[in-house]
A protein has these predicted regions:
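TPR repeat positional signature
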Residues: 8-9, 44-47, 83, 90, ...
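Alpha-helical adaptor scaffolds
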Residues: 43-83
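Alpha-helical linker/edge segments of TPR/alpha-solenoid repeat scaffolds
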Residues: 57-60, 88-96, 133-150
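Preference for long, well-ordered alpha-helical segments
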Residues: 105-147
Length: 150
C-alpha cells in the first residue's frame, strides 16, 4: 500500500512538468484522500509538492507550512524517510518566507535546513538541497523577494 501511494504521489508530481493545473488537482485529491490520519511522509510529500504548484507566494507558504506540520505527528517518531526530507522542507519554508518578505523567519528556517543537512547523502539529491540552501542564503543576504529557480 505504501509503495502504491508513493507511486500515485509521484505520478501526480510528474504531471506538473506537463500540466500544472492537472498536477495540482491530482495532488489535491490525494491530500483529501490521505486526510488527517494519512501517513506523515505521504502527507508531507503531497503538501511539499503542492506548494511548488501554487500561483502566489502566500499560497506556497501555506502548503510549505502544512508539509512541515504533517511531518510532526504527536506520538509518531520521525522515520528515516522524513528525517531525510526535513532539509528540503525547511529549505522550502525558508524560500517561501523570503518570497513574502519575512526575512527573519526565512533565516531561521534556512538555519534549520542547514542543521538537518548532515543527514543528506553525498548524492544528487543531497547536492541539490545543499545548493538550494546556498542559493536561498544569497537571496536572503540581498533581501530579495524575487521568484527565481532554486
Amino acid at each position: 500500500m505504501t509503495d502504491d501511494r508513493m507511486a500515485d504521489i509521484y505520478a501526480a508530481v510528474r504531471l506538473g512538468g506537463v500540466n500544472r493545473e492537472a498536477a495540482r488537482q491530482a495532488l489535491r485529491m490525494l491530500w483529501d484522500q490521505l486526510g488527517t490520519d494519512g501517513e506523515p511522509l505521504h502527507r508531507s510529500v503531497v503538501a511539499h509538492h503542492l506548494a511548488d504548484l501554487q500561483d502566489t507566494a502566500e499560497e506556497a507558504l501555506l502548503w510549505d507550512t502544512r508539509a512541515l506540520d504533517s511531518a510532526f505527528v504527536p506520538g509518531i517518531p520521525l522515520d528515516d524517510g522524513l528525517l531525510g526530507f526535513l532539509p528540503s522542507l525547511y529549505l522550502s519554508l525558508a524560500d517561501s518566507h523570503r518570497l513574502v518578505g519575512d526575512f527573519d523567519v526565512a533565516r531561521m528556517q534556512l538555519a534549520l535546513a542547514r542543521g538537518h543537512a548532515s543527514v543528506l547523502a553525498d548524492d544528487a539529491y543531497g547536492r541539490v538541497i545543499r545548493a538550494g540552501v546556498d542559493h536561498v542564503a544569497t537571496l536572503l543576504a540581498a533581501e530579495s523577494t524575487d521568484r527565481v529557480a532554486c
